[in-house]
């Protein structure tokens, strides 16, 4: 079925209604019929992103809507007094749990304005059901399904595999609960890492259960039954266990809602995001393409404004990268520091929001960004908003702001350091590679790949990493005074809900 079928259905319904009104002239003394309820349609056609992709034009496509775009659409619906209800249609738009939580707050805002909200999708997984728990009604496409098994996480430990390949992960961690290196150095999790991850999953699971129990009016027994029977449910089973409200074929959705609003007709309106100007680019002109590729983004406001700076991806030294065709994007310390300097000195910028969605990365890059953030904070307010994650270096940056706001399901913390090298001497032997190293200077050989560290060398590395850890911890103490590092540092992870406590 075409993705714009519902829009055509809306247009056809409006035309039919107009034709009927023109065909019959009402008597002069008759009372005009009440206007039909207005229903706003908001379609989320792909997974929202944190920030626009500057390379989208290269593939002939518009921008994916950002999460902020979608929240803006929902807020527009909430503010429009002519709207009686909102239909949110998810079209091949899998969400993260945190995205569902942020969009859910915007849905709650719509409902608080006195409007009903209906969620429609061809199928539902756990995050989409969590989003639906904020709505008045969850509608499933007839013949569709829902999957609600709970939470599951699987880790792979590669120490034996690396040994078989002749590779030794020579890694050092500072922080008993850090554990980011254990996949390479162990065959099973350490007790500390196991405790860390289990506590995180317990928190996420508790948040999930609380939201579903509240939104779907289920008690503990009912929720357990929904997971037992609804782990892979057809529409009938999903409705029986209470994780959806109705199963409706898309062409019948308007009639279904007419019943819900006690109306014989509905006035449909579309609320759509700006898809960007990718279509305006002349792809037949190589000069136009290269000019667009290397064009600097405009960041200079012409009126008083609050600036938003995205830390989205791994934190790296130097310039930010978009990731190209195969790589992952990286947030560069040089790029972000330059942006922060411009915001610091721009009198029209009255405050700065740092939006973080990052697992961390380079400690040096994180420190450089932290320093730039503190310089801004000395002159104007700085707040941090956390998306899915602000862990390790991401949290390092966050503590440079005055306040940190996170979702209940956001992941924060991981105050610790991991580093080292991969020693490939055994692999070289298997492949009959002969490596010859030539060093100048007493410590130059420390980073060679052909030999592991001695205990003395490893101790030297550990001392330098401990210095990095101590600096990280001092930044946390300065930014979060009163925080007990004995119970929060050492690499521990927290949900947003637990981090507030």
Can you describe what each PLM-predicted range is?
Residues 11-21:
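Bacterial N-terminal signal peptides
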Residues 250:
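Extracytoplasmic/periplasmic copper-protein system
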Residues 2-13:
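Bacterial N-terminal signal peptides that target proteins for export
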Residues 220-241, 246, 482-501:
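Amphipathic alpha-helical substructures
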Residues 5, 19-219, 224-232, 246, ...:
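Small-residue-centered hinge/linker elements
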């Amino acid at each position: 079925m075409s993705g714009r079928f519902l829009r055509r259905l809306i247009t056809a319904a409006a035309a039919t209604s107009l034709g009927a009104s023109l065909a019959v002239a009402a008597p002069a003394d008759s009372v005009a019929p009440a206007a039909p309820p207005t229903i706003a349609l908001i379609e989320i056609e792909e997974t929202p992103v944190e920030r626009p992709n500057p390379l989208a034009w290269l593939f002939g496509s518009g921008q994916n809507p950002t999460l902020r775009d979608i929240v803006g659409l929902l807020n527009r619906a909430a503010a429009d007094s002519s709207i009686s209800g909102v239909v949110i249609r998810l079209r091949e738009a899998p969400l993260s749990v945190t995205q569902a939580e942020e969009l859910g707050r915007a849905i709650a805002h719509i409902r608080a304005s006195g409007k009903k909200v209906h969620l429609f999708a061809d199928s539902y997984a756990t995050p989409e059901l969590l989003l639906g728990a904020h709505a008045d009604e969850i509608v499933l496409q007839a013949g569709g399904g829902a999957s609600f098994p709970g939470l599951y996480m699987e880790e792979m430990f590669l120490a034996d595999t690396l040994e078989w390949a002749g590779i030794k992960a020579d890694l050092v961690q500072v922080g008993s609960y850090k554990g980011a290196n254990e996949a390479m150095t162990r065959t099973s999790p350490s007790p500390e890492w196991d405790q860390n991850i289990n506590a995180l999953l317990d928190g996420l699971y508790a948040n999930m259960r609380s939201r579903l129990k509240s939104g779907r009016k289920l008690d503990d027994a009912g929720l357990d039954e929904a997971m037992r029977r609804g782990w892979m449910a057809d529409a009938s089973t999903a409705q029986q266990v209470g994780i959806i409200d109705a199963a409706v074929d898309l062409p019948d959705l308007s009639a279904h809602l007419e019943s819900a609003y006690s109306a014989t007709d509905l006035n449909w309106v579309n609320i759509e995001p700006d898809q960007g100007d990718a279509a305006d680019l002349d792809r037949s002109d190589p000069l136009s393409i290269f000019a667009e590729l290397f064009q600097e983004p405009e960041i200079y406001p012409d009126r008083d404004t609050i600036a938003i700076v995205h830390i989205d991806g791994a934190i790296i030294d130097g310039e930010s990268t978009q990731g190209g065709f195969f790589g992952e994007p990286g947030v560069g310390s040089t790029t972000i520091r330059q942006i922060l300097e411009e915001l610091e000195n721009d009198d029209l910028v009255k405050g700065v929001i740092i939006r973080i969605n990052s697992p961390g990365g380079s400690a040096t890059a994180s420190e450089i960004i932290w320093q730039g953030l503190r310089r801004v904070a000395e002159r104007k307010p700085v707040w941090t908003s956390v998306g899915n994650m602000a862990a390790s270096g991401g949290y390092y940056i966050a503590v440079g702001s005055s306040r940190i706001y996170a979702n209940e399901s956001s992941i924060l913390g991981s105050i610790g350091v991991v580093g080292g090298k991969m020693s490939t001497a055994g692999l070289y032997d298997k492949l009959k590679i002969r490596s010859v190293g030539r060093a100048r200077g007493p410590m130059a050989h420390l980073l060679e790949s052909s030999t592991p560290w001695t205990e003395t060398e490893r101790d030297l590395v550990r001392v330098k990493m401990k210095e990095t850890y101590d600096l990280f911890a001092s930044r946390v103490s300065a930014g979060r005074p009163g925080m007990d590092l004995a119970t929060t540092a050492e690499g521990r992870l927290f949900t947003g809900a637990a981090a507030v406590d």
